[in-house]
From Swiss-Prot:
It is found in: Cytoplasm, Cytosol. GO terms for molecular function: nickel cation binding; urease activity. Optimum pH is 4-10. Carboxylation allows a single lysine to coordinate two nickel ions. It catalyses: urea + 2 H2O + H(+) = hydrogencarbonate + 2 NH4(+). The modification N6-carboxylysine is found at residue 487. It comes from Schizosaccharomyces pombe (strain 972 / ATCC 24843). Keywords: Cytoplasm, Hydrolase, Metal-binding, Nickel. This is Urease. The gene is ure1.
Length: 835
């Protein structure tokens, strides 16, 4: 079998699974519907009785809207399949595959030998659920029009194609440089281009005359490229010379008689805002629904320029001499530009181009050619050495950071990366009993080995050593060997003596201390543990307590200025299934036995509906600052991001708008609060926010691109150090990259170690220890971990006065009871995933 046949076999398996689900009355999600139709088309091709055209039609009537979830009607626009016909391999494209109400289940189940279910199993939903405004990722565009470059003068000009073939001219092409068979007054076109939307074109048919409007080029007004007729800086005094020369070369020129000229210039080109959003993505004051959540964001500002958007493609803007600068060295130009992205970050929700150089973000704003465009940002020059990632109608966030990782298996890295995580911070050595329970890499040999073994993986890595030692020599040795933090865990004994010793060493070496406190209350209650902190900064893991910690009141620590609190994701958010799964998780992770009553009591003491409910609200208030996974040790490494947004959705559902969003009709403040929980705040906490954690100039270019409809669930692309490390990719044998099956695959950027970072202690670098390991990743020291506090947690610095009833478990914050009901349905769930 060829590799492509294995990929098609995966498609067939999912298509077959979708058929079985359909036969028992399950309405299919987008992935299931796509796979069913695609795999059935493959089977029809195998019969050898149908042409490409036949199958393009047949694929449109298999499933009706009654057979799929309502959102599929708007999300499934086309399916592309390549299959082997009797005469070879050909592409079949199914446009609008869900375009009927009832479909044809005989076609959908052909060859499966499954019984055809009754249509009564698939009642239509309420009509409002099929409305576009209820679809995931819906963009609500402000009414009105957008004027393009309104301050520029317009010059109308008559143009006739004297050739025998059509001529199409793009928006930013220097009009004087156009085809020799276009006849017009070239003197009027000197230093000008078409007044049309960026990336569009005007087509001149043979013999046809059109009147078009021209506008002056901007920037340095340096003309390059084209036919080199007017090369150089625009100089009106050169017009006659340039026209004479081009006429000698055979280019047509027809001076316009003043009597034939229009009496006045035309008004600026106007684009309806809805069309603008389709072409370039939403702009200022447009609203976007995030995935299928109830969260709505408003674009606060657009840093691109209407009429000068940088657009790549055939006949579009980013071409030599137009949107791409000529004759500039690599040092002067971006390595990669991401164009027209909606950025969601703690710094704002806005639209901009993002410039990348040497793996770092060097510019955010307007990118392009300063020779011909105004307002090009510093360090934002697009040249022949610049690659382009088009992000129109996409969201860009910074790569997520999971700050609670048990490195139990290397496959976690692949799973985390595919969810949008680009930094994993924690400890472990593989599936040892110690690592299954704790995040500790406890000695130099294992630290060296873990740094080297993760060196080739496309993930930033930071390791934590074992901090449970009331002495200091081993703790120091672990930091000097490369650990970027120390972890205190109750399974190793989180006693006041160990806490004091660990924090003292962390203070000395400027690394973070992390703690899983004492559920047993063996040495002290929570008050004793807090006293042992001595007001020193510490990251308290799973501060609610189900993941471990003083029962029942570890959650009270969120009131203190030196506590940097986080949640782990099994309790995010509180649902009707949360409590029932926790006990078995806990027993496995912490090497407990159901045959030992004390083990069972220990486990049960950690699981409390009251504190989990309180955790929801404290996250929404910004009293708990971070969300992480606790990977394979009571947590899911691929769900940090999705469960963060589920928590935000549930809180909006039950608590309404936050005061800061009240009356705005959008959730910008809430979204900034939640995105900070897995980006900037864990980066600040662990001393790496000078390098990662936010979409800002100077940060390492770990960026995640999302389709609006898939936000929070499934990235379309992940960049590591400015290079694509993961993307949604079709059949590698396909004639185009969008042929089914589309899967998240690691790309070339995943195989360059220098696109990722190993975060280590400064001591391990200055001593030369890290250099001796021979790592290929970039190496960076953590810093400024000991002089921070809750006040530094962006959008998440609230410190309410906390109480917890030791018997009823009732939690209050600033005198208010923190209670909410569990939910039985959440977004970013069965609409997106197969299993």
């Amino acid at each position: 079998m060829q590799p492509r046949e294995l990929h098609k076999l995966t498609l067939h398996q999912l298509g077959s699974l979708a058929q079985k689900r359909l036969c028992r009355g399950v309405k299919l999600n987008k992935l299931e519907a796509t796979s069913l139709i695609a795999s059935q088309i493959q089977e029809y091709v195998r019969d050898g009785n149908h042409s490409v055209a036949d199958l393009m039609s047949l694929g449109k009537d298999m499933l009706g809207k009654r057979h799929v979830q309502p959102n599929v009607v708007h999300l499934l626009h086309e399916i592309m399949i390549e299959a082997t016909f009797p005469d070879g391999t050909y592409l079949i494209t199914i446009h609008d595959p869900i375009c009927t109400t009832d479909g044809n289940l005989e076609h959908a189940l052909y060859g499966s030998f499954l019984p055809t279910p009754s249509q009564e199993l698939f009642p239509l939903e309420e009509e409002k659920l099929y409305a576009p405004e209820n679809s995931p990722g819906f963009v609500e565009v402000l009414e009105g029009e957008i004027e393009l470059l309104p301050n520029l003068p317009r010059t109308p000009i008559e143009v006739r194609n004297m050739g025998d073939r059509p001529i199409q001219v793009g928006s930013h092409y220097h009009f004087i440089e156009t085809n020799e068979k276009l006849c017009f007054d070239r003197s009027k076109a000197y230093g000008k281009r078409l007044d049309i939307p960026s990336g569009t074109a005007i087509r001149f048919e043979p013999g046809v005359m059109k009147i078009v409007n021209l506008i002056p080029i901007g920037g340095a007004k340096l003309i390059q490229g084209g036919n080199s007729l007017s090369k150089g800086v625009f100089d009106d005094s050169r017009t006659r010379e340039i026209v004479d020369n081009l006429m000698k070369q055979g280019f047509m020129h027809q001076p316009e008689s003043p009597l034939n000229m229009p009496l006045q210039s035309a008004r600026p080109f106007v684009v309806p805002r809805k069309l603008y959003a389709v072409m370039y993505g939403p702009t200022t004051n447009d609203k976007i629904r995030l995935g299928d959540t109830n969260l709505i964001v408003r674009v606060e500002k657009d840093f691109t320029e209407y009429g000068n958007e940088s657009v790549f493609g055939g006949g579009k803007v980013i071409r030599d001499g137009t949107g791409q600068s000529s004759s500039k060295s690599m040092d002067e130009c971006l390595d990669t530009v991401i164009t027209n992205a909606v950025i969601i970050d703690h710094t704002g929700i806005y639209k901009a181009d993002i410039g990348i150089k040497n793996g770092y973000i060097v510019g955010i704003g307007k990118a392009g050619n300063p020779d011909t465009m105004d307002n090009i940002g510093e360090n934002m020059v697009i040249g022949s050495s610049t690659d382009v990632i088009s992000a129109e109608n996409k969201i860009v966030t910074y790569g997520g950071m999971d700050s609670h990782v048990h490195f139990i298996c290397p496959q976690q890295i692949e799973e985390a990366l595919a969810s949008g995580i680009t930094t994993m911070y924690g400890g472990g050595t593989g599936p040892s009993t110690g690592t299954n329970a704790t995040t500790c890499t406890p000695n130099k040999d294992l630290i060296r080995s873990m740094l080297r073994s993760t060196d080739s993986y496309p993930m930033n890595i930071g390791l934590t050593g074992k901090g449970n030692d009331s002495g200091s020599s081993s703790l120091k040795e672990q930091i000097e060997a490369g650990c970027s933090g120390l972890k205190l865990h109750e399974d190793w004994g989180s006693t006041p003596a160990a806490i004091d010793s660990c924090l003292s060493v962390c203070d000395e070496y400027d690394v973070q201390c992390l703690i899983h406190t004492d559920t047993l209350n063996e040495s002290s209650f929570v008050e004793g543990t807090f006293k042992a902190f001595k007001n020193r900064t510490i990251h308290t893991y799973h501060v609610e307590g189900a993941g471990g910690g003083h029962a029942p009141d570890i959650i009270s620590l969120v009131q203190n200025p030196n506590i940097l609190p986080s949640s782990t994701n099994p309790t995010r958010p509180f649902t009707t299934n949360t409590l029932d799964e926790e006990l078995d998780m806990l027993m496995v992770c912490h090497h407990l036995s159901r045959n030992v009553p004390e083990d069972v009591a220990f486990a049960e003491s950690r699981i409390r509906a009251e504190t989990i409910a309180a955790e929801d609200i404290l996250q929404d208030l910004g009293a708990i600052s971070m969300i992480s996974s606790d990977s394979q040790a009571m947590g899911r490494c691929g769900e940090v991001i999705s469960r963060t947004w589920k928590t935000a959705h549930k809180n909006k559902l039950q608590r309404g708008a936050l005061p800061e969003d009240e009356g705005s009709g959008v959730d910008n403040f809430r979204v900034k609060r939640y995105v900070s929980k897995y980006t900037i705040n864990p980066a600040i906490t662990h001393g790496i926010s000078h390098i990662v954690g936010s979409v800002e100039i100077g940060k390492f270019a770990d960026l995640v691109l999302w389709d609006f409809a898939d936000f929070g669930a499934r990235p379309s692309m992940v960049l590591k150090g400015g290079m694509i490390a993961l993307a949604s990719m079709g059949d590698p044998n396909g004639s185009i990259p969008t042929v089914s099956p589309l899967m998240s695959w690691q790309m070339f950027g995943a195989h360059d170690p220098e696109r990722s970072i190993a975060f280590v202690s400064k001591a391990s670098i200055t001593s030369g220890v890290i250099e001796s390991y021979g790592l290929h990743k970039r190496v960076e020291a953590v810093k400024s971990t000991r002089n921070i506090g809750k006040k530094d947690m962006v959008y998440n610095s609230y410190m309410p006065k906390m109480t917890v009833d030791p018997e009823a478990y009732t939690v209050t914050a600033d005198g208010k009871v923190m209670e909410c009901e569990p939910v039985d349905k959440l977004p970013l769930s069965q609409s997106y995933f197969i299993f």
